[in-house]
């Protein structure tokens, strides 16, 4: 029996830096990222670029993922808005800023935010303030209402609600909470 030398690692398979192989590596990396949570095309593009993948490889991989429906910025934006509005209590401005940071197109952002009407946004703000006011110590000292109003309006502003809505909601809810505590 004749013995052949062991093949060297360079002869054992395709070149790991070859274009098709790099594309498969990039595809596998994207799939790993997508198992954790949905991501936008821009987020995946940034991650691949960070890893040193060339632009043509990135474009082909992302086009493939979009084609099979694994990457859909419109669906991502709608789910993000629904989730962050409902569970985190974010207002339209904060949601728009978050989606912009994630690389979602402005048209997609405005269409996904159209699902939130002003009444629903106000209801969510009222609920947030009401819940927070129940835990708040309300003094009868002069000026204490101003401190509470500032704190509550600041909380709503950080969550992306407009200043006028925040002040209106806080004023109404604070009066309601004071009345509730008197009874």
Curated annotation (Swiss-Prot):
GO terms for cellular component: cytoplasm. One of its GO terms (biological process) is regulation of DNA repair. It comes from the Bacteria. Pfam families: RecX_HTH1, RecX_HTH2. Residues 1-12 have a biased composition (Polar residues). It is found in: Cytoplasm. Keywords: Cytoplasm. Its main location: cytoplasm. HAMAP family: RecX (MF_01114). Modulates RecA activity. This is Regulatory protein RecX. The gene is recX.
